[in-house]
Amino acid sequence: YIGADGRVYFRYSTKGMTFRRNTIYDLGAPVEKAGTSVVLEPKYYTEGVSYVYGGRENIFPAVVSDVTDASFTSLPDGWRARLEKDRLVVIPDTESERGNYEIQLFAYAEGAKADIYTFRFKYDPALILYDGFDGSDIDDRYWRRFNDHHGTLWSWFQTGDEAQSPVADGKLQLKAVYEDGAYKTGAVTGQNLLDYEPPFRVDCRAAMSRRETGFWCAVWTVPTTGYQNGEIDIMEAGNHYTSSDFTSKIHCTCHNPYTLNTPSKKYEGFRPGQDQPQSGSAVLDNPNDYHIYSVEVTDEAVTWYADGVQIHQYKNIRHTTDDNGYKYAAESTTSSAGETIYPKANYLKNYPFMENRYFAIFDIAVGSSFVGGTNKKDEVPATEGFNAQFDIDWIKISKIK
């Protein structure tokens, strides 16, 4: 019988019984014995708050013990789920509408009470990821701490340590400090964990809670095939060593093989009347406070927003081999920075943003020419007491239909 506590009890001292509920699932319920019980504790699950996402398995690592058998007694139409030895897996029907959904799991241990677990999830067919950083650490299904020192300016001082990227007070805190004679900075990346295809939109609520001269921070989305194939910086900001104008603004930009092989590496500028900078900037009220930074990537344009207001756009100006820009482009030349570039080979690669899958990165960094400093790591001036912080309240990644 089912007791007032919702558990199933058996009255007789036999090995067990099987029965069928009107859900068509066959379930087993053994005799209850003292000292044994079912344990099922999913990680990253908060009732009525946790999302599940369409088009992929949603894995909730779980402590599962003393479970002899388990069956799902209630699932939304078209949904699938399974309980494994160390995880709960939920697969929504991609045709489901946005809303709240519930699944029920009947589990029992040998000689124990049978328990019914109810899990309540949120589902949005357009949503790829929502993370409010409400736990005690990053969700390692989607994020890892970055410590790949590949020589790029922003990665100079990345430690990969939790001390530089803790989760606390409902936010991801990225810290840049100078201690023990060295700079230490934090970054978190979704590389090799969660990637998504265009068209998409990324929204991120973030704040520069502590600023120092020479610090800079960014939220960006990067092609899985490499930064040069369409990196999009959703927001960048920092304290310039000399320019108060730079410091007062937030910045956004995109990179592609074409712009990286123009003399200035900045402009779509081969055709009169169609020049468009790859970068933009804006002055925000109370720039250190929380703002929502966004980007939309479609076949027509990459468009940036701050608090819902458009601040820049890079359009898909379709290049062809009939353009004079292609006909008269040099095979190779030298950029304003003294680097060898290849304009002709890359002329047609000005809008690769629809060709790649992307992942997200958050970071805080120190030094480099971006903030008016040196591009030599060992020459970044030491600043005792340096303590900058960039806080991420939440990130939302969505499909665009």
What residue spans do the PLM features occupy?
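Short, exposed beta-strand/loop patches in secreted or surface proteins that constitute
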Residues: 1, 31, 79-83, 161-168, ...
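GH16 jelly-roll
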Residues: 9-10, 91-92, 98-99, 107, ...
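Solvent-exposed, low-complexity, repeat-rich "mucin-like" stalks and linkers
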Residues: 32-71, 117-121, 125
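Short, solvent-exposed loop/turn segments enriched in Ser/Thr/Gly
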Residues: 54-60, 96-104
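Strand-loop-strand motifs at the edges of beta-sheets in extracellular beta-sandwich domains
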Residues: 75-94
